[in-house]
């Protein structure tokens, strides 16, 4: 437990009311955006390449697991992780501060392969995994860095300034995403707005942690957004994941996988947010057109 309830640790100091107000305003903003602009909720006639039409960088959640059958590694110390050069560099050399198989509790963490970056991405929840695939498919995303560690010195200063207990271990933010226009946004993925209600057992801990992350990224000139899984279009994420498995033409074995390859490269646009796409049905009767489209696109690259 990174933070204990404030009244038990610092009886003379209450949780910063300004922190509570700011975090709650963020949650309400996320809820308004998803309700009115419908960025992540299901829509009919959804044209995937234009799914993220809003100029801002939207919002999105979490639970935790080690995949069944996957080898669970012994937890490494922060010192060892730093010595390994985690969170340094970009592209296929990047390694997040926490790996999926280093999670101490049973949940839904998984390591997914990013065919664009050419590396494994470690997601610590189903929500993080779904969020990753949606962001990966966006045209304006340049770089995705998961489990980005925070400077312990900066975190300590923030905690001291606000009377928060200083965490023993180094903190990390779920995602730091760099966009093609050069802007960067840090995302914290949470299960839903219920976690931010006073009745939630996680209420105090979550508010403090989110405020620390908010203040941290603010000091580095980076926007910070809370992402709620309840606003995430899980169907869209699943369809994107199915197609991205065939991003590399070496995995293409027939007309159905040819179509998935074309969708992964956005050479073909199909509705993917309403229901799980039945590619076999789409292929039936269109085999010749799909083969020709695949040949033209693949040969032209």
PLM feature segments, named:
Residues 1:
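Helix-turn-helix DNA-binding segment
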Residues 7-10, 16, 20-301:
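Electrostatic, structured charged patches in enzyme active sites and in nucleic-acid/phosphate-binding
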């Amino acid at each position: 437990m990174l933070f204990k309830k404030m009244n038990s640790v610092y009886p003379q100091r209450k949780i910063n009311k300004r922190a509570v107000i700011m975090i709650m305003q963020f949650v309400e903003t996320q809820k308004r955006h998803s309700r009115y602009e419908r960025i992540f909720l299901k829509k009919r006639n959804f044209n995937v390449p234009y799914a993220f039409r809003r100029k801002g960088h939207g919002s999105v959640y979490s639970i935790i697991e080690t995949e069944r059958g996957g080898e669970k590694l012994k937890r490494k110390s922060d010192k060892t992780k730093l010595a390994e050069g985690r969170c340094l560099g970009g592209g296929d050399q990047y390694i997040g501060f926490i790996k999926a198989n280093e999670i101490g509790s049973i949940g839904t963490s998984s390591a997914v392969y990013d065919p664009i970056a050419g590396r494994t991405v470690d997601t610590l929840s189903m929500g993080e995994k779904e969020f990753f695939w949606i962001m990966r498919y966006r045209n304006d995303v340049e770089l995705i860095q998961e489990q980005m560690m925070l400077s312990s010195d900066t975190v300590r200063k923030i905690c001291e300034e606000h009377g928060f207990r200083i965490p023993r271990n180094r903190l990390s933010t779920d995602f730091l995403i760099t966009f093609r226009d050069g802007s960067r946004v840090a995302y914290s993925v949470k299960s839903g707005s219920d976690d931010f209600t006073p009745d939630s057992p996680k209420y105090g801990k979550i508010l403090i942690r989110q405020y620390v992350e908010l203040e941290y990224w603010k000091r580095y000139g980076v926007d910070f957004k809370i992402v709620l899984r309840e606003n995430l279009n899980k169907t869209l994420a699943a369809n994107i994941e199915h197609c991205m498995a065939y991003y590399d033409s070496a995995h293409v074995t027939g007309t159905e996988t040819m179509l998935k390859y074309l969708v992964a490269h956005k050479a073909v646009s199909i509705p993917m947010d309403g229901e799980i796409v039945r590619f076999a049905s789409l292929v039936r009767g269109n085999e010749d057109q799909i083969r020709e489209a695949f040949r033209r696109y693949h040969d032209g690259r």
